[in-house]
C-alpha cells in the first residue's frame, strides 16, 4: 500500500514538544499532568505578557500583572481582536504558522503561532 502522507521525524526542542511528541502522557498521574499543564500555561502567559505590548496593556487594564499564580486569572482577548489587530509576540519571520478563521461574518481573523 502506498502512503501519500509525507512523514517526518520531529525532534523535541522544548518541554512542551517533549510532552506532545515524545512522552507517553498516560504514564503521568492526573495530578502530575495538571501540574505540568499549569506550569506550561503560566510560562506561556508570562512570555506573551513580556513580549507583546498590546497584550501587556490589556492585562494591566484588567489589573493583572505577570505574577499571577492561577490559570483562571489569565486575561483572554476576545476573538474579535484578531479580526482588527495584528498581534505578535515575536518577529514575523519567527512565525511558524498562521491560523485563519472561516470569515463567516465577512472578515477573517488571523492568529500567528510562534515557536512557544
Swiss-Prot record:
Enzyme Commission identifier(s): 6.2.1.19
One GO MF term attached to the UniProt entry: long-chain fatty acid--protein ligase activity
GO annotation, biological process: bioluminescence
Pfam families (alphabetical): LuxE (PF04443)
Pathway assigned to this chain's UniProt record: Lipid metabolism; fatty acid reduction for biolumincescence
Keyword set includes Nucleotide-binding: yes
UniProt-listed InterPro entries: LuxE (IPR007534)
Reactions catalysed: a long-chain fatty acid + L-cysteinyl-[protein] + ATP = an S-(long-chain fatty acyl)-L-cysteinyl-[protein] + AMP + diphosphate
Protein purpose: Acyl-protein synthetase activates tetradecanoic acid. It is a component of the fatty acid reductase complex responsible for converting tetradecanoic acid to the aldehyde which serves as substrate in the luciferase-catalyzed reaction.
The protein, known as: Long-chain-fatty-acid--luciferin-component ligase
Recorded name of the encoding gene: luxE
Amino acid at each position: 500500500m502506498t502512503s501519500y502522507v509525507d512523514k517526518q521525524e520531529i525532534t523535541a526542542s522544548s518541554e512542551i514538544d517533549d510532552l506532545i511528541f515524545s512522552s507517553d502522557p498516560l504514564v503521568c498521574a492526573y495530578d502530575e499532568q495538571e501540574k505540568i499543564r499549569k506550569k506550561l500555561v503560566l510560562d506561556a502567559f508570562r512570555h506573551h505578557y513580556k513580549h507583546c505590548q498590546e497584550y501587556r496593556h490589556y492585562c494591566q487594564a484588567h489589573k493583572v500583572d505577570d505574577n499571577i499564580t492561577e490559570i483562571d486569572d489569565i486575561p483572554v482577548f476576545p476573538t474579535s481582536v484578531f479580526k482588527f489587530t495584528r498581534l505578535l509576540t515575536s518577529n514575523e519571520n519567527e512565525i511558524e504558522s498562521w491560523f485563519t478563521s472561516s470569515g463567516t461574518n465577512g472578515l477573517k481573523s488571523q492568529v500567528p503561532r510562534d515557536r512557544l
